[in-house]
């Protein structure tokens, strides 16, 4: 298992405002839990399966 920022189909992080959104997202991705990381407003997941993609595309338009 690993911790990290999950990415979508375009390999961009999930932007967020609420911890509940990220916790649900992370659990859907088979993680243990998650929260909205305040410095960059992106979901951070704890306990994701090792094969979950957490490598972000450098061309993503993100809030950070």
Curated annotation (Swiss-Prot):
GO cellular component terms attached to this protein's record: extracellular region
Subcellular location: Secreted
Positions of the LCN-type CS-alpha/beta domain: 2-61
Expression sites by tissue: Expressed by the venom gland.
Origin superkingdom: Eukaryota
One annotated GO molecular function: sodium channel inhibitor activity
More about this protein: The protein sequence seems to be related to the alpha-toxins, however experimental data show that it has a clear beta-toxin activity.
Gene Ontology biological-process annotations: defense response
Keywords annotated in UniProt: Disulfide bond, Ion channel impairing toxin, Neurotoxin, Secreted, Toxin, Voltage-gated sodium channel impairing toxin
Recorded domain comment: Has the structural arrangement of an alpha-helix connected to antiparallel beta-sheets by disulfide bonds (CS-alpha/beta).
Protein name (record): Beta-toxin CeII8
Organism: Centruroides elegans
Disulfide linkage: 12-60, 16-36, 22-43, 26-45
Listed CDD domains: neurotoxins_LC_scorpion
Primary location class: secreted
Annotated family: Belongs to the long (4 C-C) scorpion toxin superfamily. Sodium channel inhibitor family. Alpha subfamily.
Function: Beta toxins bind at site-4 of sodium channels and shift the voltage of activation toward more negative potentials thereby affecting sodium channel activation and promoting spontaneous and repetitive firing. Has a selective effect toward Nav1.7/SCN9A which plays a role in pain mechanisms, and especially in the development of inflammatory pain. Shows no lethality toward mice.
């Amino acid at each position: 298992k690993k911790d990290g920022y999950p990415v979508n189909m375009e390999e961009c992080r999930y932007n967020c405002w609420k911890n509940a959104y990220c916790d649900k997202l992370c659990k859907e991705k088979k993680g243990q839990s998650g929260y909205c990381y305040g410095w960059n407003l992106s979901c951070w997941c704890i306990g994701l399966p090792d094969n979950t993609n957490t490598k972000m595309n450098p061309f993503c338009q993100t809030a950070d």
